[in-house]
């Protein structure tokens, strides 16, 4: 069994990964607050701030990090900037700074296709995707620094899956079929 650290385990991607691999590995998750996930053998790394997280990461051995943690806002306000910075840059850099001390062999990062908007390299769609683009550039530095670790940077377009109740196109189509309404789908 491998020791796997999953960040963003309360989000859609992270929670689904957690539930799918939980019985096959020793799973660690990070959390700043109480969690609703009730899995008996789950190891929760509670932390108050990023300095506290840094200390706690130095004390554990991890084979694989699956980094799904993020703060997402499509249209930001000035009040979102601190959360975007802490979640999308600082938190991830603390993980990267501890790769060697934790003994990490693989680092899997979830990014967004929006950081290459309309197929244009390094042109962000919004501030969120600009932060994800910045983190990808930071990740490149660590890829060069730690050649003994396998890095994967996954560019996700969208997600949908079992128990997904968000207002996604599939759910909207199903809802309109049930209500016998037409749905107009338009592309630009």
Describe each model-derived feature in a short phrase.
Residues 33-41:
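Short loop/helix-cap segments at secondary-structure boundaries that form the rim of catalytic
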Residues 3-23:
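N-terminal Rossmann NAD(P)H-binding glycine-rich loop of SDR-like oxidoreductase domains
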């Amino acid at each position: 069994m491998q020791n796997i650290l999953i960040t963003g385990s309360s989000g859609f991607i992270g929670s689904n990964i957690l539930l799918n691999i939980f019985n096959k590995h020793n799973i660690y998750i990070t959390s700043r607050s109480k969690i609703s996930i009730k899995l008996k053998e789950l190891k929760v790394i509670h932390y108050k701030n990023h300095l506290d997280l840094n200390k706690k990461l130095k004390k554990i051995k991890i084979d694989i990090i699956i980094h799904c943690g993020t703060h997402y806002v499509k249209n930001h306000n000035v009040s979102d900037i601190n959360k975007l910075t802490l979640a999308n840059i600082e938190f991830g850099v603390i993980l990267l700074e501890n790769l060697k001390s934790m003994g990490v062999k693989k680092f899997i990062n979830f990014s967004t296709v929006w950081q290459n908007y309309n197929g244009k390299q390094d042109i962000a769609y919004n501030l969120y995707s600009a932060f994800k683009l910045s983190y990808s550039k930071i990740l490149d530095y660590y890829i060069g620094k730690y050649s003994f670790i396998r890095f994967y940077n996954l560019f996700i377009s969208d997600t949908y899956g079992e128990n997904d109740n968000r207002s996604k196109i599939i759910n909207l189509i199903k809802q309109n079929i049930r209500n016998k309404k037409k749905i107009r789908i338009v592309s630009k």
